[in-house]
Amino acid sequence: EPYMLASNLPGVAVLVDRNRVKAGRYAVKRLGCDTLILDDGFQYQKLKHSIEVVLVDSTNPFGNGNLLPRGILREPVRNIRRADIIFLTKCRGDVSAVKEEIRRYNTTAEIVECNHTPKVLKDVWSREEFPLDWLQGKTLCTLSGIASPKGFENSLRHLGAKVVWCERYADHHRYDSSEVLYALNRTADM
């Protein structure tokens, strides 16, 4: 993810550090940044926040209501009351019930409906681009370390690919060579 962000945002500093305060200070003092955007920063209260932004998946807004590791929530649903802007993602239909649920906790935040739409396929190493119809009729195996692998897999299916095998890892998973080799060997047999 950080590599992808840095590649697609020239001139924007992308820092990765478990100590976000240290990274924030470095960005401001050494790199001259005047704005910091944190991934998963809503629950990170050690840095002063000017604007609280939250993304809510409209297809599974609050999961089973439990916090990690028993559920998908990083903090209780009621804490959404701190949000200034709520992006309601994966909106493909009527989301009024989800908005009503959000309004139970936050009556003032702006709610923005959005949807993920792929535009192009890109080789991460060569940066070569392919049109979306390149997937039409292709048989695919997926290897993913993202929060919502089913959404990724369904996007491939909607683009006409036949997804026959999926290897899913936790969000932000760091692949090691044995995992990649396993996937390559598994797909070679198909």
Regions found by a protein language model. Name each.
Residues 61-190:
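C-terminal accessory "lid"/substrate-recognition subdomains
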